Amino acid sequence: MVMNANNYIPKEPETIECNIEKTLDVIGGKWAFLVIRELFCGTKRFGELQRLIPAVSPRALTSTLRHLEEKGVLERQVFPTVPVTVEYTLTPKGEDLHAILKQMKLWAAKWT
């Protein structure tokens, strides 16, 4: 709510910050939770993630991994091998999502 002299000027709905909206911006992609779920079990390579999530295309997986890395949920480590080896690991920020995923799993078991 914004006050201007004696006039009330309501904030536009799109300018009101919402923590849920911010969270969904970080982890709300179609494949994000599945990638995060697999990384809870430990560091994975691209090919491992693709095998564990067979419905995701390589392009979608690459996009999801880049997005999660940009948002600080996971980190990417490149090893100078031939061919190049790349591993993905959850950051502490990503690990904090464990409780949320667990609750979503319980909700789905109850209601779907």
Model regions: which residues?
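Amphipathic alpha-helical dimerization/coiled-coil segments
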Residues: 2-7, 95-112
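A general structural signal marking secondary-structure boundaries and capping sites
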Residues: 43, 72, 108-112
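Short amphipathic alpha-helical/adjacent loop interface patches that line ligand
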Residues: 43, 53, 65, 94, ...
